[in-house]
Amino acid sequence: MSTSELACTYAALILHDDGLEITADNINTICKAAGVEVEGYWPALFAKLFAKKSMDDLITNVGAGGGAAPAAAAPAAGGAPAAGAAPKKEEKKEPSEEEDMGFSLFD
C-alpha cells in the first residue's frame, strides 16, 4: 500500500469519525494538514468509493478475507485414542532418596 493510499484511507476514517462528508476536497485538506503529498487521483477515487459504499459496511466486513482457522486439530493417524476416552491418571513422582537428604555439590 502506498503512502498516498494510506493517507487517503486515514483521512476518510477521520472524516467519518467526525461525521463529515467524505469528499475529495475534504480528503485533500486533511492530507495537506498532515503534510502528506498525495497524487491528485487518490482523493477522487476514495470519494467515489465512499459515495457508493458505506464506511460502516466496510469497517464491519474487514474480517471477510483470509481462511478460517481449523476448529480442532485432526487426530493422528493410527491407533490414537478417541477424544471422549477417559484420560489416564498422572502418576505422582516420588522423590528419590538423594533428594530427600539434601546432599548436593551445588547447594
Swiss-Prot record:
InterPro entries: P1/P2_N_sf (IPR038716), Ribosomal_P1/P2 (IPR027534). It holds the Pfam family Ribosomal_60s. It comes from the Eukaryota. One of its GO terms (biological process) is translational elongation. Residues 67-107 are annotated as: Disordered. The keyword Phosphoprotein does not apply. Residues 69-86 have a biased composition (Low complexity). Keywords: Ribonucleoprotein, Ribosomal protein. GO terms for cellular component: ribonucleoprotein complex; ribosome. One of its GO terms (molecular function) is structural constituent of ribosome. Plays an important role in the elongation step of protein synthesis. Belongs to the eukaryotic ribosomal protein P1/P2 family. P1 and P2 exist as dimers at the large ribosomal subunit. This is Large ribosomal subunit protein P1. It comes from Chlamydomonas reinhardtii.
